[in-house]
Amino acid sequence: MSDKQQFIRNFSIIAHIDHGKSTLADRLLEIGQVTNDRTKKDQILDSMDIERERGITIKANNATFDYLAEDGNTYIMNLLDTPGHVDFTYEVSRSLKACEGVLLIVDASQGVEAQTLANLYLAMEQDLEILPVMNKIDLPAADVEKTKIQIEESLGLDPQKAVAISAKTGLNVKEVLEQITKQIPSPKGNSNAPLKALVYDSYFDPYMGVVIKIRIFDGRIKKGDRILMMSTGKDFTVNEVGINRINLTPKESLETGEVGYIIAGIKKVSDAKTGDTVTLFSNPTKESVPGYKEAKPMVFAGLFPINGEQFDELVDAIEKLKLNDAALVFEKESSIALGFGFRVGYLGLLHMEIVQERLEREFNLDLITTAPSVKYIIRSKNGEVEEIDNPSRFPEPITIESTEEPYVKATVITPNEYVGNIMSLAMDKRGIQLDTVYLTQDKVQLTYEIPLAELIFEFYDKLKSFTRGYASLDYEPSGYKASQLVKMDILVNGEPVDALSMIVHRSKAEQRGREIIEKLKDLIPRHQFMIPLQAAVGGKILARESISALRKNVTAKCYGGDITRKKKLLEKQKEGKKRMKQIGNVEIPQEAFLAVLKTS
């Protein structure tokens, strides 16, 4: 190990959403003098506006700073920031791959939450050193002793190693850096071996092309080197290497154990896949960095421009967004109701909301999303097996042998008094209870197996409202199970509207159909003719409502008494309405499509 290597510390901060991770990162960077009063702003590592506004971290980010420790040595600190929301677990797992240790933040006023546990397990899988940090000790509700007990009992960590801080006021934050130098090991690796570096993130810059963030495990890399991407076999020449001190700072070379970036004239992020291994073209390493998993989309939905003329702009925008979002999957699709658009695969509902918001914001588009769906398995009587995520591809019921849907193992951590509410919510969502564990006297961990389709449909919102926001949720896929699935069509004026179709469990079809139709009745404006609204499965109508006709006063121009004249005009109007009804196209406003997403 080189002298320089023993003074490098690569660490990540993991926490449940809202436990103060980005605030602690800000304080560490202030101590490392990366930010000064001129560059200082809150959540410095959250580079997107949307991250600051929502108070969440979406993209994994990083910063390098120097720290003069009490032992008289100057350490190079590489902080890799990670997201806390369950949708972005893949961003967490790849940042952890580049670290030797993590700071695990626990909010001293809230205690251990579901995401704390999930991220802890990710860190344990990678065999990282874990340093517990109790944050928000300045709050009146903070209970440090109780939090220490939870750290020992729920997390299985040594409470004596825990550091109590307030990231907001800066209290005791320096002690965190001292403990990093003492508890988190320096990076291993051989600086004389062939180059082996992990791509843990990459993003597209319009001026420089793709900027690749890497962690060097063996060897070194410098400007002018010809590099090879091991998964694609493509090679490039390095134009610049450096480290990120909030801004990209070029340097001569990157050595073993360092975290930094390279720019090599790469045009597409798909040529620098996250999790890929970079090596030298002339002297490649024998094996790539192990253990990386590709992010798999869990939720699928149609995405259409409200104005059909914006389709080309949407194509351009979604291609550009894909450059910075490795988990986004999409293919073109067309809908009779909405025209041309895309079928998009997302990591979860928050990811879906954020992608739509970024497309609308950054590319000035007006978009509409259809009801989200998951990937179902359909087994046909002729032996074929098909995976579908789009209701339009659901086969005729007569040809189906069996259907299966994905389940997830969901962990809910809640205060004691809300257990009853959560149990009834889980039952309503077809959940199967697996386990109940009392973490403390007043905190319970409930584990359920729940269909993913039920989880993505308002489960999180209802969980928060049933528990006044105190419960937390984490989930992981647990495989497919046989399920009675049907395709439900919504008919407006006798015509099925493809964008409103959905795949539902047979037991839920009537309830969902009725909810949607009642919503549509309020949202579709009255026309000059009556509009029947129906929810149907196969040929069977499950629910029906009607929007009454708008009556135009055709007799207004008749002054005085001639009753036969009035009758004649009313008959004429009736005829006209009949004709209008046959060719009558009902205008469905955009809110109607959005309402289907939120029928509670």
Curated annotation (Swiss-Prot):
GTP binds at D18, H19, G20, K21, S22, T23, N135, K136, I137, D138. The keyword Metal-binding does not apply. CDD domains: EF4_II, EF4_III, LepA, lepA_C. It is a peripheral membrane protein. Its EC number is 3.6.5.n1. InterPro entries: EF-4, EFG_III/V, EFG_V-like, EFTu-like_2, G_TR_CS, LepA_C_sf, LepA_CTD, LepA_IV. GO terms for biological process: positive regulation of translation. It comes from the Bacteria. It catalyses: GTP + H2O = GDP + phosphate + H(+). It is found in: Cell inner membrane. Residues 6-188 form the tr-type G domain. One of its GO terms (cellular component) is plasma membrane. Its main location: membrane. Keywords: Cell inner membrane, Cell membrane, GTP-binding, Hydrolase, Membrane, Nucleotide-binding, Protein biosynthesis. GO terms for molecular function: GTP binding; GTPase activity; ribosome binding; translation elongation factor activity. Coiled coil: none annotated. It is an enzyme of class 3 (hydrolase). NCBIfam families: lepA, small_GTP. Belongs to the TRAFAC class translation factor GTPase superfamily. Classic translation factor GTPase family. LepA subfamily. HAMAP family: LepA. Required for accurate and efficient protein synthesis under certain stress conditions. May act as a fidelity factor of the translation reaction, by catalyzing a one-codon backward translocation of tRNAs on improperly translocated ribosomes. Back-translocation proceeds from a post-translocation (POST) complex to a pre-translocation (PRE) complex, thus giving elongation factor G a second chance to translocate the tRNAs correctly. Binds to ribosomes in a GTP-dependent manner. This is Elongation factor 4. The gene is lepA.
